[in-house]
Design a protein with these regions (language model features):
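Metal-dependent phosphohydrolase cores
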Residues: 2-212
Length: 212
């Protein structure tokens, strides 16, 4: 590792420790989000408040697969697919499925190989996910059912919109064939909805699964 990379890594480590012990007020730092029904347009990173309408707006405009699919496909539509798979195929609480990627309303959808190289990003993502799970009263950690539905969704999506149709994707839980069967024999597919439709779909599913 070069001295420059070491220096940058050390800076990130020191900055993270500073943030953990910081006496900064909740007003710092923040990012702008789409205003909610009360007009709130700031998301305080160390004092997060989760507003479904703002989350839906962001996830509906966030491209899954970093925009490398054949068509635009949103994190919002993916989340609805995971929730539906939990309800109809896997089991578990679909409400968790709707919210399993909600941290991506604040952070980008970063591929797993890059996440392995970015420990600070993984740390921040974990903080956001923990906050979401506490706020919406979800299990402390991602459940087996949600993880299974997420993998099934990955292979269903890839077969439809990804280069090489996902044939090169790792399959640690041997779920590829089950996903392809769901797609080919039971009609599970994605629509690649425009973002406004994906936003409305996510909000409808959020309301429905939150009250079932």
């Amino acid at each position: 590792m070069s001295d420059q990379v070491k220096s940058l890594s050390q800076w990130h480590t020191e900055r993270r420790e500073q943030m953990r012990s910081s006496s900064e007020t909740p007003q710092d730092p923040y990012i702008h989000i789409q205003p909610d029904e009360d007009g709130n347009s700031r998301f305080y990173i160390r004092q997060p408040v989760w507003r479904p309408a703002s989350m839906a707006h962001s996830m509906a405009q966030t491209a899954r697969y970093r925009g490398n699919a054949d068509e635009f496909y949103s994190v919002a539509e993916h989340s609805v697919l995971v929730a539906a798979l939990m309800r109809e195929v896997v089991g578990g609480d679909p409400y968790e499925g709707i919210l399993h990627d909600a941290a991506e309303s604040i952070l980008p959808d970063v591929s797993a190989p890059f996440k392995q190289l970015l420990p600070d990003l993984r740390y921040e993502e974990k903080l956001l996910d923990t906050s979401i799970r506490q706020h919406f009263k979800l299990p402390e950690h991602k459940t087996t059912e949600c993880a299974t539905a997420d993998w099934l969704a990955l292979f269903i999506e890839a077969a439809q919109i990804m280069p090489e149709r996902g044939s090169d994707f790792v399959d640690p839980y041997n779920l590829r064939q089950k996903a392809l069967k769901l797609r080919e024999q039971e009609g599970w597919a994605i629509k690649c909805l425009p973002w406004r439709e994906a936003k409305a779909l996510w909000l409808d599913a959020f309301e429905y699964f939150g009250h079932v």
